[in-house]
Structures are given as structure tokens and as C-alpha cells.
A protein has these predicted regions:
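FAD-binding core/adjacent interface of flavoenzyme oxidoreductases
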Residues: 1-9, 65-170, 247-254, 265, ...
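Beta1-alpha1 glycine-rich phosphate/pyrophosphate-binding loop at the start
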Residues: 4-71, 168-210, 287
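A Rossmann-like FAD-binding core segment of flavoenzymes
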Residues: 68-80, 86-105, 109-111, 188-275, ...
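Predominantly flavin-linked oxidoreductase catalytic cores and closely associated redox partners
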Residues: 119, 125-222, 229-236, 311-312
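FAD-site-proximal beta/loop scaffold in flavoenzymes
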Residues: 128, 150-160, 263-314
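A conserved FAD-binding loop/helix module that cradles the flavin
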Residues: 307-338
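Active-site-proximal substrate-binding core of FAD-dependent oxidoreductases
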Residues: 312, 333-365, 379-382
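Signature of N-terminal electron-transfer/Fe-S-associated modules in redox systems
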Residues: 322, 383-472, 485
Length: 492
């Protein structure tokens, strides 16, 4: 049986940060297990920007954030291995393409992979960092047939961004979580017609900035207080029935509306991935779907810690990293003899919501009533413009009053003022997409790319079209310029 001080299960942002933190805090025997063939977790398919503002101090795409997190782990191991530090060389072993089937309260791990088959691992401490999963159609109980073309937004994201498959031509998004909003924009950039985003609640579930840059920028209507009440089609989806709902979210008879479409993407919530937690006898919080935990993220089973979306769903990867750093430190201290805090696991784990991160607020709701293809709403002849700032996840509600210079209110920082003034005269955006790459064996793969800085919003489609027609040659590294003004955000 293999033995380690700490075993981290999951190689996404939480797992990478937890392993790094454990090494920094004196642990010299760490195993990081990832079921995929590469590290990074869900970040690898999240090619959009918006990551890293807190942890790295700059806006990154998901693959860039994953690359930086891995580089941080490697650099930490290298610096701690310096003989001048006087510390024992830390060892962080990584097992990819390895599936963990079960963990026990005694911290025995049962796993398997193609190389080693079935094997057991013993650990002094375990850090759970398995992330979360989407609610599928079965959990939503949508009536109707079971044709092709109905899938979660995350699955569609993988098909489009990783595999290069187009999932449909006429698309409806059910739910307004951030992944659904982001995929609405992504589908338009890939040539699909996104007919609507439908939300059962009276306000969107995603961040206000994503309402602006994913829906309003591309003329995609958002319908609130509505839901899908039937799915139609035999082999392929042919359409859906949409109904209004009352205050109890019950469909209202007589409000049905038919929409012809071939694809329905579900963005209706995330659930912590906790099958392993339950098998280990860890108490699960019914409010979060994740484990009860102490202030240092130790679960109800001594020596088993949890961090990231497996503990509770986060809005921002930066907050996942912050939480994982704490969990890694606590696990290292536990291994070195610190007392367990398992008896302090409570029903309200410490949450990092970010600084005023919020969904669309009531003061911004008027923007939904405007032409979604416009840059912002205005109050008649007064030329007062209302908009949501997209600079950071805070999503401030801005008002621009004409003058010389224009007066901007509602912003929390100077960047918001600059954004608002520019948004009226020359709106700018960053394009993120994928490009085909010819590998060394002659096969065609795909990597993520972005515009090298912001470009005029009206040039988004022309640049996207140019990228989609291009095949580049490998090798390509993160940060390489693959076309004039276009840089790679992942590598071959």
C-alpha cells in the first residue's frame, strides 16, 4: 500500500492551491490525484476571461488561471527544495487519469487507473477538492420526450471548447446562471442563433456583468418568471413549451408559448460532488450540499478536509483558491500534530462571497427592458445613460449624465468611470474563442485564444471569423501570438 502525508483529490484550482499550501507549510509527502488526463479541472473548458482579478491581480481566462496555478505549485516546490532553505525536499506526486472509488474514515483511498489497475493508498490527511456538477434534466423534472439536443450548459461547453463540436443551430438556454449566460454568448460566436434565455426566478442568477456582456451585447432576450414545461421531438429536439410561473414557481395555465429550436441548454444550478464524502461517513450540510466544516475546513471526520466547490459552490475561482490555501495549511498542521477541529464542524461554513459580488439588482432591472443590442439605456431626450460595469464581478450600476466632462455615478473605482465614458462612444471588449491547430502527428486539435487586449466591440465577429478559418501549426505555448493581435491561452 502506498503511503503519503497528505492526499489531495482533485486537480482543479482548489486541488492545485491546496497542494501548494500544504508544501509551503512543511508537508514533504503529498499526492495529487486527478481523474482527467490533465490538471486544471473545469478551468480548461472555461475559455472566457474574468478569472484571476483577486488572486493574480489581472484578468485571465480559465486555462490561463489553471496554467498560473500549476506554475505556482511548481515554483513553490522548487523554492522549498533549495538547499539553502534548510528544509527537506517536498515531494508532490501527481497521478492523472486516476479514478478514486472510495475513501474511508481511516483515510484509506481506493483508486484505479490504466497503468496500475486497482490499488490502495494510505494517508495521514485527505483534502477533498472534487468540485461540483450540474443539475441534469432528471433533477429538473421537465415533462416531454427524450430527444437529442437537450444537455447541460457545461457539457455543451466541453463539446464546443474542447472537442470542437457544434451542438446546435437554434438554441434556448434554461436558467440564467453564469455558465448559461457565458454559453449563450459562446454559441452566438460559433454561428448559432440563441433565441432566448429563460429564468424561472424574478431576477437572473448570474452576475450583472454577464447579463451585459453575454446577453445584451449580442441581442439575446432574457425572459424572467418563465420556465420550460414541455420538450418536443423524437430523434432530435424540435421545440419546447414555455409557460409563465406564479410566485410559488408553479406554471400558470393558459400562458403556454411554443418555441421552435433544436437545442436546449440547462443552466439550473450546481451541486457539490460529494459521493466520496458520503462514503467516508462525512456529515453533509443540507443547505450547501457540501460537508459540514470547521473554520479551517476540516470535515466531521478527523483529518479529512474539504475546499472549493465540493464544500460549497463559489462564484469566483479566486475565492476557491483562497479557501484551498487555508485548507492546505490546516491539513499540514494536522499532519504535524495539531489537534483536530472535526468536532467544530458546523452547518454554516466560512464563505468568501467576494467584495459586493451580486446578481442583477433592482436598480439595474430597467436595463432588461431596453433593446438588448444597445450599449446602455437612456432616459429619453436627457441623454442620461444607465449601464452595468463589466470591469469586475462587482457589476456596479452606473449612470452617466451629459456634461463636459460627463458625470459618472454609481462606480466603486476610477476604472468604472473610465469604462462608462468609453462605453457610450467606443465600447471595447476582449474576444475569447478557440483556434484549430495541426499537431505533430498531423491530426487537428484545438487550443483556446484571446485578443491581445480589448478591441472595438463591433470588430468581435470579424476577428472571430478570421480565427475560425485559420489552422495554426504546433507547438504553441501559453502567451504565444498565433495571429496578429491574437494570443494563445492554452498550449499544445
Amino acid at each position: 500500500m502506498r503511503s503519503y502525508d497528505i492526499v489531495v483529490i482533485g486537480g482543479g484550482p482548489a486541488g492545485l492551491a491546496a497542494a501548494k499550501s500544504a508544501a509551503e507549510n512543511g508537508c514533504t509527502s503529498i499526492l495529487l490525484i486527478e481523474r482527467d488526463t490533465k490538471l486544471g479541472g473545469i478551468l480548461n473548458q472555461c475559455i472566457h476571461n474574468g478569472f484571476g482579478l483577486s488572486h493574480f491581480g489581472e484578468e485571465l481566462t480559465g486555462p490561463e488561471y489553471a496554467f498560473r496555478a500549476y506554475e505556482e505549485l511548481k515554483n513553490t516546490i522548487g523554492s522549498l527544495s533549495d538547499p539553502k532553505s534548510g528544509k527537506k525536499d517536498p515531494a508532490v506526486e501527481i497521478l492523472l487519469d486516476t479514478f478514486v472509488m472510495e475513501i474511508t474514515p481511516e483515510k484509506t483511498i481506493y483508486a484505479m487507473n490504466k497503468k496500475d489497475g486497482y490499488f490502495e493508498i494510505s494517508a495521514k490527511a485527505i483534502i477533498l477538492a472534487m468540485g461540483c456538477r450540474e443539475k441534469a434534466r432528471g433533477a429538473l423534472a421537465i415533462p416531454g420526450t427524450r430527444p437529442a439536443g437537450v444537455m447541460t450548459a457545461g457539457l455543451a461547453q466541453h463539446y464546443v471548447n474542447i472537442d470542437g463540436y457544434m451542438v446546435g443551430k437554434r438554441v434556448v438556454i434554461l436558467g440564467s446562471g453564469d455558465i448559461g449566460l457565458i454559453m449563450a454568448r459562446r454559441m452566438v460566436l460559433e454561428g448559432a442563433e440563441v433565441l432566448a434565455c429563460i429564468e424561472i426566478a424574478p431576477q437572473p442568477g448570474g452576475l450583472a456583468r454577464n447579463i451585459t456582456q453575454c446577453l445584451q451585447d449580442y441581442g439575446i432576450p432574457l425572459y424572467l418568471r418563465k420556465t420550460v414545461t414541455a420538450i418536443h421531438g423524437k430523434d432530435r429536439l424540435t421545440g419546447i413549451t414555455v409557460s409563465e410561473v406564479d410566485e410559488k414557481y408553479t406554471p400558470i395555465p393558459g400562458t403556454e408559448q411554443e418555441i421552435s429550436c433544436d437545442t436546449l441548454l440547462l443552466s439550473c444550478g450546481l451541486i457539490p460532488e460529494n459521493e466520496l464524502s458520503r462514503k467516508a461517513g462525512i456529515s453533509i450540510d443540507p443547505k450547501t450540499g457540501g460537508p459540514f466544516s470547521s473554520d479551517v475546513h476540516e470535515t466531521s471526520v478527523p483529518g479529512i478536509f474539504a475546499c472549493g466547490n465540493v464544500l460549497h459552490v463559489h462564484d469566483l475561482a479566486d475565492n476557491v483558491t483562497k479557501e484551498a490555501i487555508e485548507a492546505g495549511k490546516a491539513a499540514a498542521l494536522y499532519v504535524s500534530g495539531a489537534p483536530s477541529t472535526a468536532d467544530q464542524a458546523i452547518s454554516d461554513p466560512k464563505v468568501f462571497p467576494g467584495k459586493a459580488v451580486k446578481p442583477l439588482n433592482s436598480s439595474s432591472e430597467k436595463a432588461l427592458q431596453q433593446d438588448p443590442s444597445s450599449d446602455g439605456s437612456s432616459d429619453g431626450d436627457t441623454e442620461v445613460h444607465h449601464m452595468t460595469c463589466i470591469i469586475c464581478p462587482r457589476g456596479c450600476s452606473l449612470t452617466v449624465t451629459p456634461g463636459n466632462p460627463p458625470k459618472v455615478t454609481g462606480n466603486a473605482c476610477p476604472r468604472g468611470e473610465n469604462y462608462a465614458i468609453a462605453e457610450i462612444s467606443h465600447p471595447m471588449r476582449t474576444l475569447t474563442t478557440t483556434i484549430r491547430v495541426r499537431k505533430e502527428d498531423g491530426t487537428i486539435g484545438r487550443i483556446s485564444v484571446k485578443s491581445n487586449g480589448e478591441i472595438p466591440k463591433q470588430e468581435i465577429f470579424s476577428l472571430a471569423g478570421k480565427i475560425h478559418k485559420t489552422i495554426i501549426e504546433s507547438p504553441v505555448g501559453v502567451g504565444d501570438e498565433v495571429l496578429p493581435g491574437v494570443i494563445a491561452t492554452s498550449s499544445t
